[in-house]
Amino acid sequence: MSMHLKNKLGLDWANEKYIRNLYQELGIKGMKPVFKTTRAGKAPYGKFPYLLRNKFIRFSNQVMATDITYIKTPWGMMYFTAVIDLYSRKILSWRLSDSMKTDFCLECVKDAFEEYGVPAIFNTDCGSQYTSAAFVELLQSYNVEISMDGIGRCKDNIFVERTWRTLKYEWIFLRDYSSAEELRKSLGEFVKFFNSERIHQGLDYKTPDEVYEASLITNRLKTKPMAA
């Protein structure tokens, strides 16, 4: 918060001590994320190994990941899925559904691949949507290496979990929604905010868009042919 006020609003006096005192004065307390434990679905292809342990991610589009989070609304449960670039934390694509069917997960992945290209590795948890034949075969059709978290190991997909935490505690819980369309519009606004405005400490206080684009430029320069 302090870095956001300094970098984005020019409030150099807003240090961490000021923010802590302000939170105490307003009665604001930090919230701890509650991680879900994923149950493995029926897996016609079995469970794929987790490929990201000790893996150094060097550039954008090298590794993408996805997951589903639940949004409780007055008219029932809604389900939000997104594909995230793990190097930059950028949300590449997203979908909202009123059911947990695999279809909206498939469409979300297709959206990301069509707009941003195909990664070397794609990581998921081992939920039924991601271990289904349709999902596995989609990734295999793109020759993508499939990586899956261990059951109950939310830290294997920690950057996606942190995105859900930001979505819930900095956006969803601060707003009221009266319809699915209103929620959908708000989620689009969140994605724009998250990608282009919200700075991340883990990204050296840059936004996902800034890191993503800088990585693409660097890669273009590396692959640019030398003049004769």
Feature locations, PLM:
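Hydrophobic (often cysteine-bearing) scaffold residues that line and stabilize catalytic clefts
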Residues: N15, F48, N61, F80, ...
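An active-site-proximal beta-strand-loop segment
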Residues: I57-L92, D98-M100
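Mobile genetic element proteins and their domesticated derivatives, centered on retroelements
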Residues: M1, I19, L52, D67, ...
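C-terminal domain-tail junction helix/linker
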Residues: Q140-V144, T166-A228
